[in-house]
Every structure is written in C-alpha cells, then in structure tokens.
C-alpha cells in the first residue's frame, strides 16, 4: 500500500512538472494579440458574446468571455489567448497519465519497471507537446486546444472506468464521461471521435 502511494505521488508530481514546463514554453511563444484565421472571430465573439460561424462554440465563447475580464493586460486578445497555453499544458499532463494507464495494461506492473513506465510516458508526452499541430494551437485563441483537452479527459476517464468497473462507484465515471461529451459539443465536434474508443472499452476491457 505504501509503495503504491509513493508511485501515485511520483506520477502526479511528474504530471504537474509537465504542466508547468509546457505552460512556460507555450506562454513564452503565445501570440501577443490577434493572429490569423479564426482567432479574430473567436476573440471578438467571446468579448461580445456573439455567434461565430456554424456550428457555433458556446462553451468556448463563455470561457473566453471569462478570461477577457481578467485585468492582466490592456489587450483583450492577449487575455483570451492565455487560456490556450493553460489548457494545452493541462492536456499534456493528462496525456502523461493516459500513457501510464496504457503501459499498465500492456505490461504486468512491478516495482522494477516503474522508472521505465514513467520515463516512457514523460518522453511521449513531451514529444507530443512540441508537435506542430499541438504547439500551433496552444499559442492562440482557438477551439482545438480546449477540444483536445476534453477529448483527452474523456479517454482518461474511460480508462479509469474500465480499471474500476468491478467497483460500486464505477457508474460515476460513466456519468462524467457522458456529461463531458455533452459539454464538449459546445466547443467542437472532435470529441465524438471518442465514441468508438468507449464502445471498444465496453466490449473488450
């Protein structure tokens, strides 16, 4: 029990380290104001609580409006842009936890492979953190950063549910998954791609 508690503490500590490390890089390279493509539209509609292009992104706009109220800069675009580095860094921390879950399922978990498991997950998460697509969306006001976080969160909760499905509280994970998928449609429809993964978890795991 004590060993497992130590491993959990190490795991969550590394996730926090990943969050702050990637946030520092994303914030350092963040767009200081409005950038290209849809960002100007999202910033403007967040500020006035307007309606962007279909199918709309109401949850993203509400969060953007909240960040626009923070008195951290005179530039509204800068305030709203800050949300993307935060949520993108959180996605990387979640990815680290997801990788650990996958490795546990692929290999029998022993004390000897803890370093290998955490090391592999840490490197994999950092590698993804600085891929072009993720980094590009982590530095401007776009829906993809938050959508990626919601998708990762649904995947992580699905894995936790499958791991604890024999326990009495497993239904809580399913309720959270369904609720988050509903919220995610107010950001982007990307989250619907998790449905096949959830279905496979129901059948196979």
What are these regions (language model features)?
Residues 1-25, 110-123, 203:
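Start-transfer (signal-anchor) and selected internal transmembrane alpha helices
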Residues 13, 95-130, 165-169:
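Transmembrane-helix signature of polytopic, membrane-embedded enzymes
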Residues 16, 82-111, 153-157, 203:
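Transmembrane-helix motifs of polytopic, lipid-linked glycan transferases
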Residues 28, 73-77, 81, 109-114, ...:
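Aromatic- and kink-enriched transmembrane "portal" helix at the membrane-lumen/periplasm boundary
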Residues 30-42, 52-64, 78:
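Extracytoplasmic catalytic/substrate-binding loops of multi-pass membrane glycan-assembly enzymes
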Residues 45-48, 124-125, 173-187:
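Membrane-interface alpha helices of multi-pass inner-membrane proteins
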Residues 58, 70-93, 97-98, 114, ...:
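Loop-to-helix entry region of an early transmembrane alpha helix in multi-pass inner-membrane enzymes
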Residues 108-115, 154-173, 181, 201-202:
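Membrane-interface transmembrane helices that cradle and orient dolichyl/undecaprenyl
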């Amino acid at each position: 029990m004590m060993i497992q508690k130590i491993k959990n503490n190490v795991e969550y500590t590394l996730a926090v380290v990943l969050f702050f490390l990637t946030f520092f890089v994303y914030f350092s390279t963040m767009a200081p104001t409005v950038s290209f493509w849809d960002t100007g539209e999202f910033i403007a509609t967040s500020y006035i609580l307007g309606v962007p292009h279909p199918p709309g992104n109401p949850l993203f706009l509400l969060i953007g409006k909240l960040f626009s109220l923070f008195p951290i800069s005179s530039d509204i675009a800068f305030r709203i842009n800050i949300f993307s580095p935060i949520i993108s860094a959180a996605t990387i921390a979640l990815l680290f936890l997801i990788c650990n879950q996958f490795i546990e399922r692929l290999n029998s978990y022993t004390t000897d492979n803890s370093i290998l498991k955490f090391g592999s997950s840490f490197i994999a998460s950092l590698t993804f953190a600085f891929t072009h697509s993720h980094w590009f969306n982590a530095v401007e006001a776009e829906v993809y950063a938050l959508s990626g976080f919601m998708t990762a969160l649904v995947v992580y909760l699905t894995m936790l549910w499958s791991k604890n499905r024999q326990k009495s509280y497993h239904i809580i994970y399913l309720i959270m998954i369904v609720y988050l998928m509903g919220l995610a449609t107010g950001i982007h429809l990307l989250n619907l791609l998790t449905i096949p993964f959830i279905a496979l978890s129901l059948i196979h795991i």
